[in-house]
Amino acid sequence: MQLLGYETGALAFSTQAESGEHERWADEEPKPEHSKSLTGARGSAYSRDPGSMIPAILEKMRPRWGLAASLFLLVLDGSGVGRAAEPNMIGQYRARRIALRKSLDDGITVLFGHREEDGDLRTGFFQESNFYYLTGWQEPGAILLLAPLPDDSHAPGYAARAKLPREILFLPERNPEREKWTGRKIGPEDDNVGKVTGFETVMPAEKFETELHDMLQAYARIYTLTEQSAAARLKLLEPLREISNAASAIAKLRMSKSSEEIALIQRATDVTLDGHRAAWQRAAPGLYEYQIAATMTEIFAESGCERNAYSPIVGSGPNSVYLHYSRNSRRMDAGEVLLMDVAAECSGYASDITRTIPVGGKFTARQKEIYEIVLGAQNAAIAAVKPGMTLSKSAPNSLYKVAYDYINSHGKDLHGERLGKYFTHGLGHHVGLDVHDASDPSAPLEAGMVITVEPGIYIPEENIGVRIEDVVLVTGQGAKVLSAGLPRDPGEIEKLLGTAAPARH
């Protein structure tokens, strides 16, 4: 699944892993024309751009408060319902914050959670993933303020810095009238707020302005996520100084997965495989693509996964050649291929699996030829996965090149040309809290990283699109395929499809 897009809650700034509803293949610039909705994932559909909501009072406050006024006003209207940080993960969230504070040791860090769209009953609220990664907090309107780890007591300004809180979580105060609609949420005034958040210092969001001002007396630099949209970005950044981007530091932490994170990704993957198996059993001529998508989504929910990791991509026949086809509205016919790029999200962590099967139970000779080339490319790339390799297209140690070279040296199109030109996207991406998780595609792989390996060939002239995608854990010795339980061999696929249920109309 090669798409990503959501606005971050950190001033609605976007990072490399959060490209504002633009597809981002490894090593390439965003491509808005390929952007797709992330219904069911953390997306811009779930938050408003704070930059479009700056009131006129901002200009009056700037002379006194500067950055504090600018940032504070962006989150005052946060409200809604969420849930507390997972108790068994609180220590891990704290360890992540400590690691970030150690990395960004010359300034304070300010991050904002998402805010809830008033009256939005279609999607609900989903937390900004960087904020969730560091806090585990699931309610809207929160702010995180971090100071560096304690420094040398002999360093200049130590006395002033030592008096400041090191970690503050700001929460909106409860609104009883709003809670009549949204349900009860947790406010800074609640007696157990420290226990449920895992923070020693929790304050009302209204105090963020003052606390930030106090910290600015001791630290000159502020880290946040610094890419904001449109004119509001200029209004905010013009009067500010010493603003640095925290995106790369956070992405570096998120790229390496803990054992708990790997277990959650494995859980999402196992459920995803169950969904694919159910879809295979149902797929038959006469059904509609959306019925296949619904079958998988039902399995995800019944298995305890809260949502799809992204909008299902279920393309049959001519629709199989479109990378991010999501209309899912066509009636399937016998003799076509059906490409299903669908996955679950469980406990906040995504999987990302694609399989291509024949509608009617048997590949044609040409479909099987193309399928086996893609499978060979994927096998070659997975065999090459090890620490030190990259997902970048241009690096000498590129996994993409392994897959591309295989495709380009096997088979031809109807005009006798090589097939490499039909492999039109990157090989893969990192997976985690986001289906396209925060990462640096040029960085060498390390043990503990989780990536996808997903070569594909898409030939519009033949109405054949084939992609095979698996989730892979990088180990010290090579790779462990977390999705190995779902067949890829065309013979095994055909055997399983032989028991497919008849079409239901």
In which residue ranges do the predicted regions lie?
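Short, strongly patterned local motifs
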Residues: 1-18, 25-26, 33, 37-39, ...
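Generic detector of N-terminal low-structure segments
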Residues: 15, 74-75
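Short, positively charged and aromatic/hydrophobic N-terminal segments
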Residues: 21, 46-53, 57
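Sec-dependent N-terminal signal peptides
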Residues: 67-73
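C-terminal segment of classical bacterial N-terminal signal peptides
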Residues: 75-82
